[in-house]
């Protein structure tokens, strides 16, 4: 066993850990050890670097932890996929590259919780801007010199994108020119974490590339954190496995857990911090009985509403092996073409009922009919909407099953446990069908492939959801921030009752945000990095933002009325 000492030890080189490693080592007198269980982000591996290849990392275990849930009781007892990134970049190395920050009211809602007043939207917006370089330039909402490259969809891409946005507007919903700007609500172009050269903009590329050569940062890959070490109620270091060696590293200041919503509570529990009854089941000495560790687990569930496309404009030909070498060559040489996009270039957020204070349904539009992980491709030209509810009241948990750090934990999201879940998914299917019936899609829209136009009743739609809904890969909230009995960390990510230990990742969200989670996770890390460094917080923004204030969910009648059921 070998022993080393650093000021900070970061467990997990993902969306948050790479931010912290980069920001903390900007101070040359600070030493940081960054541990990552996976390997490097190989820049010549098209599976992680080509945006259009986003499905490939989910099909293996090189870059994916490939967790599975316990049988989900409300989803036909299916064991459901729970892919998380493994390697430098974490889940930003394998995600769908959709840059969505969430709704302003998500953060204003966080700030209504006691002790979280400094997490209001206008307090968070400066940190979103700090992290970002947007290709069309900065403004009150977007940054121009941050580590994360953000590309905005341009006119003239696949005609299905423009048609689907226009169909949403014809159905009576708003149009928005920026889902991360003044108004999230509505349909419009979607920002993506893609570089100007058409490469995935993971946090390994954006952040670590700035910091790799610093003498005060040591990055160790294939390093699996076993447990956090304590002296009384103070974290003093980490024991990790590196090859055949067990290594101990000591932290002079803090241990920073950035392992994500599944592995962060798993590491805490394995180290003796968590629900006492769970720890005693595995004969783990209890350092602190903290009941919220692993509880409050949340995710976004989504379904694919798929249609045949009457015109040959979908991405269906790109799925054929004989067309892929040309696509790959253009991407590799020029950074352009079909390979340079994740093809989630349009989407939207709507309220399905007037009394919803902010959007409860998200859309990703895709000009092909296929599962997110590349499976079940429809053998014809098609298109689809990924549709799901945003703030499910259902809550799950992550529970340790073994003291072995290689063993996966027990994961139960408890999807669709509440009546509101079912109402929102039925509403979403019916709203989507109405959108797809609008004149803008007449030249493209063929028959409905999924769920199938013959499924109309509540019971039929519920049966479809149970059998076909899937994760959107947004686990969060399992080490929530706050000050109630189930809170795990305070407003600066410090674990309650323990000195020298923080959790900084999507697990500390008190409530899941409206949209994808990569951008909010980066923001959280940027904000807490300033707290760790004892920097003055960035000046609060004075940007304006949209609040519905009871306005109708639709501004007008649909161009084409709903079909009679």
Curated annotation (Swiss-Prot):
Chain coiled-coil ranges: none
Pathway noted in the entry: Amine and polyamine biosynthesis; betaine biosynthesis via choline pathway; betaine aldehyde from choline (cytochrome c reductase route): step 1/1
Known EC number: 1.1.99.1, 1.2.1.8
Keyword Oxidoreductase on entry: yes
Catalyses which reaction(s): choline + A = betaine aldehyde + AH2; betaine aldehyde + NAD(+) + H2O = glycine betaine + NADH + 2 H(+)
Binding sites annotated in the UniProt record for FAD: 7-36
Cofactor: FAD
GO BP term, example: glycine betaine biosynthetic process from choline
An example Gene Ontology CC term for this record: membrane
Pfam families xrefs: GMC_oxred_C (PF05199), GMC_oxred_N (PF00732)
Molecular-function GO terms, alphabetical: betaine-aldehyde dehydrogenase (NAD+) activity; choline dehydrogenase activity; flavin adenine dinucleotide binding
Matching InterPro entries: BetA, FAD/NAD-bd_sf, GMC_OxRdtase, GMC_OxRdtase_N, GMC_OxRtase_C
Top EC class for this record: oxidoreductase
UniProt KW keywords: FAD, Flavoprotein, NAD, Oxidoreductase
Active site: 474
Keyword Transmembrane (UniProt): no
Function: Involved in the biosynthesis of the osmoprotectant glycine betaine. Catalyzes the oxidation of choline to betaine aldehyde and betaine aldehyde to glycine betaine at the same rate.
Family label: Belongs to the GMC oxidoreductase family.
Protein name (Swiss-Prot/TrEMBL): Oxygen-dependent choline dehydrogenase
């Amino acid at each position: 066993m070998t022993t080393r000492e650093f000021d900070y030890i970061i467990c997990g080189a993902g969306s948050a850990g790479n931010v912290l490693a980069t920001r903390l080592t900007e101070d040359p007198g600070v030493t940081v050890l960054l541990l990552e269980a996976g390997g490097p982000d190989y820049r010549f591996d098209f599976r992680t670097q080509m945006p259009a290849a986003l499905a490939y990392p989910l099909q293996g275990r090189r870059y994916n932890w490939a967790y599975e849930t316990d049988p989900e009781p409300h989803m036909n007892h299916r064991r459901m996929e729970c892919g998380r990134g493994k390697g430098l970049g974490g889940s930003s190395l394998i995600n769908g590259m959709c840059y969505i920050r969430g709704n302003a009211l998500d953060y204003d809602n966080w700030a209504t919780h006691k002790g979280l007043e400094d997490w209001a939207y206008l307090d968070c917006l400066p940190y979103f801007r700090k992290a970002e370089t947007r290709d069309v330039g900065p403004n009150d909402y977007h940054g121009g010199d941050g580590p994360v490259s953000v590309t905005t969809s341009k006119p003239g891409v696949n005609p299905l994108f423009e048609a689907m946005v226009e169909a949403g507007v014809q159905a009576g919903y708003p149009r928005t020119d920026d889902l991360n700007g003044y108004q999230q609500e509505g349909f419009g172009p979607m920002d993506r974490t893609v570089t100007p050269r058409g490469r995935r903009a993971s946090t390994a590329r954006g952040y670590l590339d700035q910091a790799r050569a610093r003498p005060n940062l040591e990055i160790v890959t294939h390093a699996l954190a076993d447990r956090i070490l304590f002296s009384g109620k103070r974290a003093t270091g980490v024991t990790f496995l590196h090859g055949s060696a067990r290594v101990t590293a000591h932290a002079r200041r803090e241990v920073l857990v950035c392992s994500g919503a599944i592995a962060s509570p798993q590491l805490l529990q394995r180290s003796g911090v968590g629900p006492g009854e769970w720890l005693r089941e595995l004969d783990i000495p209890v350092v602190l009985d903290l009941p919220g560790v692993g509880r409050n687990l949340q995710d976004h569930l989504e379904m694919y509403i798929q249609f045949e496309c009457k015109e040959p404009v979908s991405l269906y030909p790109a799925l054929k092996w004989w067309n892929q070498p040309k696509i790959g060559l253009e991407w590799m040489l020029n950074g352009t073409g079909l390979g340079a996009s994740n093809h989630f270039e349009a989407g939207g957020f709507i309220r399905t009922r007037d009394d919803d204070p902010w959007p409860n349904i998200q859309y990703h539009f895709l000009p092909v009919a296929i599962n997110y992980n590349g499976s079940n491709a429809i053998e014809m030209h098609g298109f689809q909407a990924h549709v799901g509810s945003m703030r499910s009241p259902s809550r799950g948990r992550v529970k340790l099953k073994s003291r072995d750090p290689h063993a996966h934990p027990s994961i139960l999201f408890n999807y669709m446990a509440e009546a509101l879940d079912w109402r929102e998914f039925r509403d979403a299917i019916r709203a989507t069908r109405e959108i797809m019936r609008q004149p803008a899609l007449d030249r493209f829209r063929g028959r409905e492939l999924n769920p199938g136009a013959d499924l109309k009743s509540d019971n039929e739609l519920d049966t479809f959801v149970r059998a076909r809904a899937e994760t959107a890969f947004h686990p969060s909230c399992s080490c929530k921030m706050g000050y109630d009995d189930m809170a795990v960390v305070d407003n600066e990510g410090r674990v309650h009752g323990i000195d020298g230990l923080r959790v900084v990742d999507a697990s500390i969200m008190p409530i899941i945000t409206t949209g994808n989670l990569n951008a909010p996770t980066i923001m959280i890390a940027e904000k807490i990095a300033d707290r760790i460094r004892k920097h003055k917080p960035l000046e609060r923004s004075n940007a304006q933002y949209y609040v519905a204030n009871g306005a109708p969910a639709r501004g007008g009648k649909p161009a084409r009325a709903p079909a009679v059921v």
